[in-house]
Amino acid sequence: MTELYTAANPAEALKLVSLPEDELFVGATQLRRATFDNRITLCAIINARSGNCGMDCRFCSQSKHNHTPIETFSLLPDDELRGRILALGTQPVARIGVVTSGGALSGEEFDRLLGVLRSLPEYVLKRVCASLGKLSAVQLAQLMDIGLDRYHHNLETSRRYYPSICTTQTWDQRKATVERVFGAGMTACTGGLFGLGESWRDRIDFAFALKSLGVTHVPMNFLHPHPETPLAGQPPLTAGEALRIVAVFRHILPTATLRICGGRPLVLGARQKEIFAAGANALMTGDYLTTQGRGLVDDLAMIDSLGLEVDCDQSC
């Protein structure tokens, strides 16, 4: 393989899948370093509204179509939400994500959230991003006007495979939301979930769809099977396959931020350190929405042990 090789089309990307792991990782590491050097960015999220979602996503513990025993609650009180954002603002995280379950916030909830965000000091607000479901162009413009420049909305998987995991919203509807994010002048944090039963071709088509949309911030999650969901019995990915997915994505999206998020402790286990060799340059630290993550202290120690450095630049 030549230095800084990238996959220009799905056929080239499929050839990468069968490469020896060490060869694949060498190329992925070179590509990561070419754009990000040894800088790693962290983000953390706040579960601001949990459960009772009307979507029927087969993997999701928050869907009311499933019966996973999780804590459910409406939008956090304003003071509590503000306090949790400010607390994360003291940590070395480049981004603080406010996440709500469900297809969309009500008008009253959205206005409340805007009020909380407006009350934040600028040095914290500029690090906040939001994941609030399907928003209109007007709502996205309101977020942009108060200082939010990034919005999270996943496509989850390939357009072909998506109907296998959700029927209450189409892939094209999700794509339209991402396009509205760009139309509002914001950057989109858009990725998905792996280990749903999708094929390698689905994964590669998904990566090229993100590239076609111009997505430059890609959260990568690995299925953590939840009880009482249709995918409760789905075997988790092996660590080797999960790392290979990251490396192939790096060859398709050479300059994008690849952020390893949900499922990291379960799927990668003792191989978590290898995410950077596989091409990732960012990770989510702390707990996820309804599952336990890895603590900030442990993640900082891991990054330091590898001779890498934490970058708090919110543009990453």
Curated annotation (Swiss-Prot):
Binds 1 [4Fe-4S] cluster. The cluster is coordinated with 3 cysteines and an exchangeable S-adenosyl-L-methionine. Binds 1 [2Fe-2S] cluster. The cluster is coordinated with 3 cysteines and 1 arginine. Disulfide bonds: none annotated. SUPFAM superfamilies: Radical SAM enzymes (SSF102114). GO terms for biological process: biotin biosynthetic process. Its cofactor is [4Fe-4S] cluster; [2Fe-2S] cluster. It comes from the Bacteria. Gene3D superfamilies: Aldolase class I. Residues 36-264 form the Radical SAM core domain. [2Fe-2S] cluster binds at C129, C189, R259. The keyword Phosphoprotein does not apply. It catalyses: (4R,5S)-dethiobiotin + (sulfur carrier)-SH + 2 reduced [2Fe-2S]-[ferredoxin] + 2 S-adenosyl-L-methionine = (sulfur carrier)-H + biotin + 2 5'-deoxyadenosine + 2 L-methionine + 2 oxidized [2Fe-2S]-[ferredoxin]. It is an enzyme of class 2 (transferase). Keywords: 2Fe-2S, 4Fe-4S, Biotin biosynthesis, Iron, Iron-sulfur, Metal-binding, S-adenosyl-L-methionine, Transferase. PROSITE patterns: RADICAL_SAM (PS51918). Homodimer. Belongs to the radical SAM superfamily. Biotin synthase family. This is Biotin synthase. It comes from Desulfovibrio desulfuricans (strain ATCC 27774 / DSM 6949 / MB).
